[in-house]
Amino acid sequence: METVLSFSAIAVAIIVGLCAVGTAIGFAVLGGKFLEGAARQPEMAPMLQVKMFIIAGLLDAVPMIGIVIALLFTFANPFVGQLAG
């Protein structure tokens, strides 16, 4: 049982780490492309900003699902119940 808990802790750490790295890379690319587009066409900056915020919200949604799965493995691990019963 300790093996399942230790592997679950490692899996949670990997999930949280990859969520953080993936979100950081996504925001870096998104911000860079926004600044590039705004520098090329300054009159389009307000429209690009609205689209950037919409995409930023969608970009945050995927890691939040990963964090929910990590919390599930942390506090309500389904694999421990299989070992006990």
From Swiss-Prot:
Q: Which Pfam families match?
A: ATP-synt_C (PF00137)
Which parts of the sequence are marked as the site Reversibly protonated during proton transport?
Answer: 60
What GO MF annotations does this protein's record show?
A: lipid binding; proton-transporting ATP synthase activity, rotational mechanism
Q: Name one GO biological process term.
A: proton motive force-driven ATP synthesis
Q: Give the record's keywords alphabetically.
A: ATP synthesis, Cell inner membrane, Cell membrane, CF(0), Hydrogen ion transport, Ion transport, Lipid-binding, Membrane, Transmembrane, Transmembrane helix, Transport
Instruction: Sum up the protein's function in the record's words.
Output: F(1)F(0) ATP synthase produces ATP from ADP in the presence of a proton or sodium gradient. F-type ATPases consist of two structural domains, F(1) containing the extramembraneous catalytic core and F(0) containing the membrane proton channel, linked together by a central stalk and a peripheral stalk. During catalysis, ATP synthesis in the catalytic domain of F(1) is coupled via a rotary mechanism of the central stalk subunits to proton translocation.
Name of the protein in question: ATP synthase subunit c
| Organism of derivation | Vibrio cholerae serotype O1 (strain ATCC 39315 / El Tor Inaba N16961)
- What is the phylogenetic placement of the source species in the record? Bacteria, Pseudomonadati, Pseudomonadota, Gammaproteobacteria, Vibrionales
Q: Which gene encodes it?
A: atpE
